[in-house]
Amino acid sequence: MTSDPHGTQGIVSIGSPLPDAAGVLILLHGRGGTAEDILGLGEPIAPEQWAMLAPQASGNSWYPFSFLAPREQNEPYLTSALGRVRAAVDMALAAGIAADKIAIAGFSQGACLATEFVGRNPRRYAALLAFTGGLIGPPGAPIKLTGDLAGTPVLLSSGDPDPHVPWARVQQSADLLQEIGGRVTIRRYPGKPHSVTGEELRSASDVLAVA
C-alpha cells in the first residue's frame, strides 16, 4: 500500500482562471462522489469571478471507515486526503489568492475532511462550509484545536437524525471551532435526508457573498 494513496489524483478547476480569480472555492466530494459532481454543487454558491477547485479521491472515497472510527483505521488515507486539500490551498496561494479569499466546502465525507483541515490548519479563510460533517475522531476521545481562525465564517448544517453524522458531533465541532476564533453558524434540519438542500445552498451563498 502506498503511503499517499490520493497523491496522484488530479484537481479539477472551473470558473475564473486562477490568475484572474477574485477568490477560490475548494470543494470536497463525499464517499462515492467525484470532483465533477461536487463542482455542480459549487456553481450556485460561488461568487462571480471566483475559481473553483475540486480534488479527486482515489476510488472515490477519502478514507475507508466512518469519520468516527479510530484515526489509525483510516490511515494512510486520511493524511493523504488532508494533503490533497493542502495542495488545492497551495495552488490558490501560488496564484496570488490571499488566504482570506479561499473558502473550503464539502458534503458528507468531504464536509468532515473540510472541517478537519480548517480546524487543524487555522487562519483567516473566506469561509468553511460543511454540509453534513464534523471534526474527525471517535466519540469520547478528546479533540483539541489550537491556533486562530481570526473570525473565519463557518457554516455547519446537517439533518437530525442523520445516518452517518450524529448531531452531537456537529454541535461539538461548532463549539470547538468557535473556541479558536471561528464565527460559527449552525443549521439543524430535523428529518432532512442525507443530501444538500436548496436552503443550505442559499445559506452558503449568503456567506460567500460577503467573503
PLM segments and residue spans:
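C-terminal catalytic histidine-bearing segment of alpha/beta-hydrolase fold enzymes
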Residues: 31, 171-211
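Gly/Ala-rich beta-loop-alpha elbow adjacent to hydrolase catalytic centers
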Residues: 106-110, 114
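Short beta-strand/loop motif that positions the catalytic acidic residue
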Residues: 155-158, 162
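Short alpha-helix in the alpha/beta-hydrolase fold that links the catalytic acid
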Residues: 38-41, 141-142, 166-176
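Short beta-strand immediately N-terminal to the catalytic nucleophile in serine-hydrolase-like folds
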Residues: 104-106, 131, 157
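Active-site signature of alpha/beta-hydrolase-fold catalytic machinery across serine-
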Residues: 40, 116-120
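A conserved short beta-strand
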Residues: 123-136
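Serine-hydrolase catalytic machinery in alpha/beta-hydrolase-like enzymes
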Residues: 2-99
